[in-house]
């Protein structure tokens, strides 16, 4: 879609939602909405919780810019509704969104594509699990299968702390992933227009890049480009693109890795709707890696909006 064509559209920026990441989504959505208004586009901010279809009809939305995070926004649900309503939207389609949001199924897809993933086990709510039952030793990372922004994530170093970590993760999901803890650089690759645009390194003040570090100013150092030898820098970008393709993603995403001292790149996850706040990583990668201002990034994503039925994503 050209800029002139986009000018003719009434854009609904979908934000808020019902997930544990609601507050972050509101920040992302308002940043996108303000950028669209500043460029002269017909944008309306929509806090979608219930009656989404009714809101979209009443507002006469021609195009949806999805700034939702977490359940119902990032997992294929809203994408399916928009497909049914024949409203073009930004980002990946139903299947790719659902796969990326589900950490177990996405890991299986990554492994099938030959990408390196962290060793893992799963635990269902109601099952008892102790450290001796795990196929690898402590420390481990415990996380809900379907949450983002590190919600419900705990690093467990002592056997007696495992059950509390599982209980915390079970607050958000009935299936929990237990991953072997891998020490390495936290590196995140930006994908835009289905191509890698750079890799940034995160050095959190906390033990890992948790919710506080992601959304509180000064809680993490961002280093661009990531401090990797050039061959390794190119390797992690290429693997980011492979992960994007393995899930059938469309347009843009952010791919998270742990890179060890010996050059192994452990793929953690693909974020199909990465944050678009002032502290978010994709806008920073786009600015430093591709020379795109925040407004230019928003415009490019909006112009890529489409229906995906019949496509891979």
From Swiss-Prot:
Its cofactor is Mg(2+); Mn(2+). Its main location: cytoplasm. PROSITE patterns: ATP_GRASP, DALA_DALA_LIGASE_1, DALA_DALA_LIGASE_2. Residues 107-303 form the ATP-grasp domain. Keywords: ATP-binding, Cell shape, Cell wall biogenesis/degradation, Cytoplasm, Ligase, Magnesium, Manganese, Metal-binding, Nucleotide-binding, Peptidoglycan synthesis. ATP binds at residues 135-188. SUPFAM superfamilies: Glutathione synthetase ATP-binding domain-like, PreATP-grasp domain. The keyword Magnesium applies. Transmembrane segments: none annotated. It is found in: Cytoplasm. Mg(2+) 1 binds at residues 256, 269. InterPro entries: ATP-grasp, ATP_grasp_subdomain_1, D-Ala_lig_Van_CS, D_ala_D_ala, Dala_Dala_lig_C, Dala_Dala_lig_N, PreATP-grasp_dom_sf. It catalyses: 2 D-alanine + ATP = D-alanyl-D-alanine + ADP + phosphate + H(+). Binds 2 magnesium or manganese ions per subunit. Mg(2+) 2 binds at residues 269, 271. Gene3D superfamilies: 3.40.50.20, ATP-grasp fold, A domain (3.30.1490.20), ATP-grasp fold, B domain (3.30.470.20). Pfam families: Dala_Dala_lig_C, Dala_Dala_lig_N. Belongs to the D-alanine--D-alanine ligase family. Cell wall formation. PANTHER family: D-ALANINE--D-ALANINE LIGASE, D-ALANINE--D-ALANINE LIGASE B. This is D-alanine--D-alanine ligase. The gene is ddl.
């Amino acid at each position: 879609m050209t800029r002139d064509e986009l000018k003719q559209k009434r854009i609904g920026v979908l934000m808020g939602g019902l997930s544990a990441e609601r507050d972050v989504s509101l920040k992302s959505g308002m940043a996108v909405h303000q950028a669209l208004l500043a460029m002269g586009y017909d944008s309306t901010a929509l806090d979608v919780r219930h009656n989404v279809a009714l809101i979209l009809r009443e507002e006469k939305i021609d195009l949806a810019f999805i700034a939702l995070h977490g359940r119902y926004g990032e997992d294929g649900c809203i994408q399916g509704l928009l497909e049914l309503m024949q409203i073009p939207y930004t980002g990946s389609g139903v299947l790719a969104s659902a796969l990326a949001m589900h950490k177990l199924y996405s890991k299986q897809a990554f492994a099938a594509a030959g990408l390196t993933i962290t060793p893992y086990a799963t635990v269902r709510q109601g099952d008892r699990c102790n450290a001796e039952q795990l196929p690898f030793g402590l420390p481990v990372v415990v996380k809900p299968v379907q949450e983002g922004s590190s919600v419900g994530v705990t690093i467990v170093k002592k056997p007696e702390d495992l059950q509390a970590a599982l209980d915390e993760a079970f607050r958000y999901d009935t299936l929990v992933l237990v991953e072997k803890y891998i020490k390495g650089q936290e590196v995140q690759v930006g994908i835009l227009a289905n191509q890698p645009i750079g890799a940034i390194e995160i050095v959190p003040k906390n033990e890992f890049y948790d919710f506080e570090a992601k959304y509180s100013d000064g809680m993490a150092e961002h280093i661009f480009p990531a401090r990797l030898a050039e061959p390794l820098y190119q390797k992690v970008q290429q693997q980011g693109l492979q992960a994007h393709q393995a899930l059938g993603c469309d347009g843009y995403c952010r791919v998270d890795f742990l890179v060890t001292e010996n050059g192994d790149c452990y793929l953690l996850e693909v974020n199909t709707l990465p944050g678009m706040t002032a502290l978010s990583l994709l806008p920073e990668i786009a600015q430093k890696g591709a020379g795109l201002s925040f407004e230019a990034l928003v415009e490019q994503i909006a112009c890529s909006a489409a229906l995906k039925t019949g496509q891979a994503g």
